Curated annotation (Swiss-Prot):
Protein known as: Phosphopantetheine adenylyltransferase
Lineage: Bacteria, Pseudomonadati, Pseudomonadota, Gammaproteobacteria, Enterobacterales
Gene name, Swiss-Prot/TrEMBL: coaD
Localization: Cytoplasm
Annotated substrate binding sites: 10, 42, 74, 88
Organism of origin: Klebsiella pneumoniae (strain 342)
Amino acids binding ATP: 10-11, 18, 89-91, 99, 124-130
Enzyme class: transferase
Superkingdom assignment: Bacteria
Keyword ATP-binding appears in the UniProt entry: yes
E.C. number(s) listed in UniProt: 2.7.7.3
Length: 159
């Protein structure tokens, strides 16, 4: 039986921390769907199509990873994808409370949906898309935290 996992997020933009998590998930599961949420309420810097394109390029080396955009409830998306595993990254204790709430709600909506939590490697444990964008807006060098294609897209977006 093959295993399919979903790694959902806004990925605005995708960072090396996200790449770390999806790479490790790809080694654990037969297929991983990198599910990019439309998240219009978050007012993303990049459009959904841009985020899909950036993530597709950044994960091209991972043959069992597919990038898909979505706008419905995660449980509905998981059901449509015939997947019952969600991958979530945990950077710090502060992430845990929110992730626990999400996991319980997702299990309520889809009782077979399991959440698997991965901690990023130490090098990426403190970064977030929001932090990277904020530093970049103030001309800080964020190239170390982003795939090259994403870094260039961020610089272009901030011009």
């Amino acid at each position: 039986m093959s295993t399919k996992a979903i790694y959902p997020g806004t990925f605005d933009p995708i960072t090396n921390g996200h790449i770390d998590i999806v790479t490790r998930a790809a080694s654990m599961f037969d297929k991983v769907v990198l599910a990019i949420a439309a998240s219009p309420s978050k007012k993303p810097m990049f459009t959904l199509d841009e985020r899909i394109a950036l993530a597709t390029q950044a994960t091209a080396h991972l043959v069992n990873v597919e990038v898909i955009g979505f706008s419905d409830l995660m449980a509905s998306f998981a059901r449509a994808q015939q997947a019952n595993i969600l991958i979530r990254g945990l950077r710090a204790v502060a992430d845990f409370e929110y992730e626990m709430q999400l996991a319980h709600m997702n299990r309520h909506l889809m009782p077979t949906l399991e959440s698997v939590f991965l901690m990023p490697c130490k090098e990426w444990s403190f970064i977030s898309s929001s932090l990277v964008k904020e530093v970049a807006r103030h001309q800080g060098d964020v190239s170390h935290f982003l795939p090259a294609n994403v870094h260039q897209a961020l610089l272009n977006k901030l011009k």
